[in-house]
UniProtKB/Swiss-Prot annotation:
Record note on quaternary structure: UreD, UreF and UreG form a complex that acts as a GTP-hydrolysis-dependent molecular chaperone, activating the urease apoprotein by helping to assemble the nickel containing metallocenter of UreC. The UreE protein probably delivers the nickel.
Protein known as: Urease accessory protein UreD
Keywords noted in UniProt: Chaperone, Cytoplasm, Nickel insertion
Protein location: Cytoplasm
MF terms in GO: nickel cation binding
Keyword Oxidoreductase: no
Membrane-traversing stretches: none
Gene: ureD
Family annotation (Pfam families): UreD (PF01774)
Family of this protein: Belongs to the UreD family.
Keyword hit for Cytoplasm: yes
Function comment: Required for maturation of urease via the functional incorporation of the urease nickel metallocenter.
GO cellular component: cytoplasm
Length: 276
């Protein structure tokens, strides 16, 4: 029987403190709120005890961040899309930010096992003055464990309505996409870090963030397969390809730290669970 799990997170600013409240149905919840940066920024960790998704499973994650609140959400482990012989798997995430809200959406990687049939959808709604930094890391198969991605299908959709939309369909039989230098060029990990704003970013802020990202990229081993751009005056995007997850995560976290400093004048302060 498929699992259908839902989680609703609501963040509000109360007396200079960001407070999290949540409701859940099924095996999806958050751990205790942490405040390593003080009361203004709330860190939460998503937990999905089954550890993976199979045919017909659905995860529905929704987070609402109120005016002036700042939330950081990560996950306790990778999202695992297992082999599926039947109905597709769907993970749907909807993030909504009120005026002046900030959110860091920083889940660990999604692992697409051989013969999976999965869709991962992320939608962000940003009010004027709201800002969100988000990460997406996808690994195709487990080639180092002798389980390459040679069958299956994965659909990836990321959207900030009216500003930016990315939609990709990866079919394991599409060798032109997987092997071509104009596609994934044989890499089994693709990742992006994005910064979206509900109001236009000044040219100075965009230039500062892009310069910071490019300096990190130039000093990294993945510099030939990574790049940072600004498709419009409300969005910044870092994209990269990697042979495996670890170097991709390393680069994303370094750029995230650089963007925190350049855009928000904040220290890196990685979630504690990343050190485990």
């Amino acid at each position: 029987m498929p699992w259908h799990a839902r989680l609703q997170l609501n963040y509000t600013r109360e007396h200079a403190r960001t407070v999290a409240r949540f409701e859940h149905h099924g095996p999806l919840r958050v751990l205790q709120s942490l405040y390593p940066e003080g009361g203004g920024i709330c860190h939460n960790v998503l937990v999905h005890p089954p550890g993976g998704l199979v045919g017909g499973d659905q995860l529905d994650i929704r987070a609402s961040v109120g005016p002036g609140a700042h939330a950081l959400i990560t996950s306790a482990g990778a999202t695992r899309f297992y082999r599926s012989m039947g109905a597709p798997v769907l993970q749907r995430t909807c993030l909504s930010l009120a005026p002046g809200a900030r959110l860091e959406w920083l889940p660990l990687e999604a692992l697409c096992y051989n013969a999976c049939n999965a869709e991962n959808r992320l939608t962000l709604t940003l009010a004027p003055g709201a800002e969100c930094m988000g990460a997406d890391v996808t690994a195709l198969g487990l080639p180092h464990a002798g389980q390459p991605f040679v069958a299956g299908r994965f659909v990836q959709h990321i959207e900030i309505p009216g500003l930016w939309r990315e939609h990709g369909v990866i079919d394991a039989t599409d060798q032109r996409l997987l092997r071509s230098p104009l596609g994934l060029a044989g890499h089994c990990c693709m990742a992006s870090l994005f910064f979206g704003a509900g109001s236009a970013l000044s040219q100075a802020r965009r230039d500062s963030a892009l310069d910071a990202a490019r300096a990190v990229i130039d000093a990294h081993a993945l510099k030939t397969t990574a790049g940072a751009t600004s498709p419009c005056d409300q969005v910044l995007v870092l994209r990269l390809l990697a042979p495996q997850v670890e170097p991709a995560m390393q680069l994303l976290r370094q750029v995230r730290a650089a963007w925190r400093a350049a855009l928000w004048q904040l220290d890196a302060e990685p979630p504690r669970i990343w050190a485990m």
